[in-house]
Amino acid sequence: MMSACLGFRELGLQPYEPVLEAMRRFTEQRSPDSQDEIWLVEHPAVFTQGQAGKAEHLLVPGDIPVVQTDRGGQVTYHGPGQLVAYLLLDVRRLGFGVRELVSRIELALIDLLASYAVQASAKPDAPGVYVDGAKIASLGLRIRNGRSFHGLALNVDMDLAPFRRINPCGYAGLAMTQLRDLAGPIELDEVRTRLRGQLVKHLDYAEQTTLTGGID
């Protein structure tokens, strides 16, 4: 059964930690009737450690800050030109288990990439989306009281060099790739629009809307 309307907030370039705190507040304060939201954002350069993160996977962070988070997974990198989507969903209301939610997000990303003639796939033992073994999108979620927060990060048109300062997602030597290198020059706004459509489709929402106002 399709859910009603999925709301999107397009936040532009935002520091990581204030968005993290806003996600937590939204999740703690929402009611059973709250509209599900997805926040689309870019972050200045930052490494984030998941709950399973190990210090040895931070090789040489250097001048890039490291933030400990409460999402699943290990260490990853965020930076300008990477499209991040935070999925603030009532998973219980949607009727999805965690594994199904992850699979639906991966399929949305795979179909998005296919629209650029990029053939991608998921791995059963390593959440995310890959192209010829190189990772193009990372996933890390947290479920609290049946509601999800955190989300996905898609490499679109960014500097990939900082990934070499870590073992991405805890895998030594994991190659990273991005859409620009596979499909040529890319407009981030267009990718954002296509991602919205794919998430609405794969998460079984009837429609979408753009939400205005801040996240404070």
UniProtKB/Swiss-Prot annotation:
Major localization class: cytoplasm
UniProt keyword annotation of Cytoplasm present: yes
Domain BPL/LPL catalytic: 32-207
Keywords, in A-Z order: Acyltransferase, Cytoplasm, Transferase
EC number(s) recorded for this UniProt protein: 2.3.1.181
SUPFAM superfamilies in UniProt: Class II aaRS and biotin synthetases (SSF55681)
Residues making up the signal peptide according to the UniProt record: none
Pfam families: LplA-B_cat
Presence of the UniProt keyword Cell membrane in the record: no
Pathway: Protein modification; protein lipoylation via endogenous pathway; protein N(6)-(lipoyl)lysine from octanoyl-[acyl-carrier-protein]: step 1/2
Name of protein: Octanoyltransferase
Gene: lipB
